Amino acid sequence: MKISTRLLFMAIVFLLGSTMSCNKSENTSGTDDLMQSLDNSVYHEWVQVFLELDRYAAFFRPGPAPRALAYLGLSAYEASLGGMPDYQSLQYKLGISDMPAIKKNLYWPEVINASYAYLMTKFFEDVTFKDKNGNVLSKQDFLNLIVNKERELKAKYRNDASEELLNNSEAHGREVATAIWRFSISDPVGHNAHLNPFPVPVNAQGCEWIPTDPITVADRGLFSQWGKVRRFAVTQGDLDALISPYTCNSDTNSVIYAQAYETYVVTNLARKEPKGDMEHMAEFWSDDRVGWTFSPPARLEAIADQIAKEEDFNLEKTCLLYAQIGMALSDAAVICWYNKYKYNVERPITYIQREIDPKFTIPWLGFTPPFPAYPSGHSTFAFAGVGILEAFVGGSYPFTDYCHQQRTDFNGHPRAYNSLRDLANENAFSRLPLGVHYRMDYDGGNFCGILTARRVLQLPWKR
């Protein structure tokens, strides 16, 4: 009798345990999980969507793209703090007045999924999409990429969490994203700047910058007001910390002549060897053309995505990475464009045609970007992005960039580097064989980018 009673008791315990483990409505998977225990795949999925939209978004480069990345990363970070006990909100530091309360016991991948879906729709809903020939593409097709990705991921998460838990997580992600969107649109210069990309005339005097490409309004530069966009970490003092560029001078012994001549020589070397390393470098890092590739700042997001996957960062670490690199790239655009229009340095093609070779042209790309030269945007973005990435993987991290390995319309063969700083240096230098920058632009971008990354890392992230 005692044996039978004991067996009956064990059978009941077994059945109860089996029922509870199989009952999906009672599944609390994720409710007690911190972000550290989860994988980062939700970020990879959304980065790929962003890169596809960014590639075809007209007048979304170079400023609006990193600005969007900053708010996307910030929103996901703020929404996920309930699963990141070592980190704190930046609400008061940034001046966000109506941030929802931190919530715990949510399924964090769905929180991030909902946040990205809401904000990405908001940032791209008024954008015109064009192919590389300038033909307007269906906006709805691109917005559907967002809708479909959100649905796809939520359906996937039903294998891990109950419907109630997913709905609560989605609601919180959207609530935080809505607050971040209100914060975004309160920036009068940055909000919807892509709808008026040539806002004010630029009055060139002497040998200051003048437009050199056919798409630029005759007396206006692209995003000439971007230096007034809201910043996340960089101060006004930081904006003015960049040293003055070398002054315009026709003397063949002047520094600016030597720098222009270097660009002239390096560009012609690339032109003479269309399959050589100089040309490969120039094409590989260009990312200038809408419809061809994603934008130069988004390139650093793509590199971050590759590193996060290769190193298998957990969800908390990845969340922090994208919050920080987004802010750094956004502030990099502000400090760079502030100084571009502060100094109005003419492009090398203008100086070279006037002082060195009137027949000089830009190889491969065929045009110079429609804004002043100093400092270089590519350089600033590269060093800002790398400055953040080094905080996660160190200064001696070897890296191979596969961003364009499938391309056949230009040389996208992967390039390998001994460190991320080497990558940033090559990205910056690549603008010389392309013929669009001086070496001082590269150096100025180095200074601005590293300073920007340092300021973002100094924000009070940790409790």
Residue ranges and their predicted role:
Residues N23-R463:
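Acidic/polar surface patches and capping/hinge elements
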Residues F9-L16:
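Hydrophobic helical h-region of N-terminal Sec-dependent signal peptides
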Residues S18-S21:
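C-terminal motif of bacterial Sec signal peptides marking the signal peptidase cleavage site
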Residues M1-F9:
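Bacterial N-terminal signal peptides that target proteins for export
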